Amino acid sequence: MASDHQTQAGKPQPLNPKIIIFEQENFQGHSHELSGPCPNLKETGVEKAGSVLVQAGPWVGYEQANCKGEQFVFEKGEYPRWDSWTSSRRTDSLSSLRPIKVDSQEHKIILYENPNFTGKKMEIIDDDVPSFHAHGYQEKVSSVRVQSGTWVGYQYPGYRGLQYLLEKGDYKDSGDFGAPHPQVQSVRRIRDMQWHQRGAFHPSN
């Protein structure tokens, strides 16, 4: 019934969020399907997340229950093992998830050197930036103002390291977006209909 998801103009409509968590790698073993927030994955009967299939997203997962700890952004696609959804490779724990609301096609973000939106700043509009250094910005990122769109920031260039979900709003210091240090060196937009066949860190060209 794919036609249910098409308008007369042929443009895809946003789908209800849907993600399937499997206990084993490569989509094997016991599984559980989610269509809304899940504060504790173990309460669904899934002891450990071994692989993830996102049928409609995007989603954000967390290392700890109740949306705490390291963050992992999932877009529509297949994540056959834990290291396909984390590039920090610090933990294989995935304990809670929630859908990400994507309500804007336009994207604008301002990153500031110091807390409370002070110091040097870099403004990004409708673009992904794999390296702040290449754009001449070598400062730390201590506060962020997301004026439109939904973004994910990364600790290192090339979309590597810890991930930080940046939804519309103000983040007065790095702790507000979950960063242990004011270090963000790349950022990209989250768009509702993106497809990553092998997970967000192996985009097809």
From Swiss-Prot:
Residues 102-106 are annotated as: Connecting peptide. The modification N-acetylalanine is found at A2. It holds the Pfam family Crystall. Keywords: Acetylation, Eye lens protein, Repeat. One of its GO terms (biological process) is lens development in camera-type eye. Residues 2-16 are annotated as: N-terminal arm. The keyword Repeat applies. InterPro entries: Beta/Gamma-Crystallin, Beta/gamma_crystallin, G_crystallin-like. SUPFAM superfamilies: gamma-Crystallin-like (SSF49695). Residues 193-205 are annotated as: C-terminal arm. Residues 17-56, 57-101, 107-148, 149-191 form the Beta/gamma crystallin 'Greek key' domain. Crystallins are the dominant structural components of the vertebrate eye lens. Belongs to the beta/gamma-crystallin family. Homo/heterodimer, or complexes of higher-order. The structure of beta-crystallin oligomers seems to be stabilized through interactions between the N-terminal arms. This is Beta-crystallin B2. It comes from Canis lupus familiaris (Dog). The lineage of its organism: Eukaryota, Metazoa, Chordata, Craniata, Vertebrata. The gene is CRYBB2.
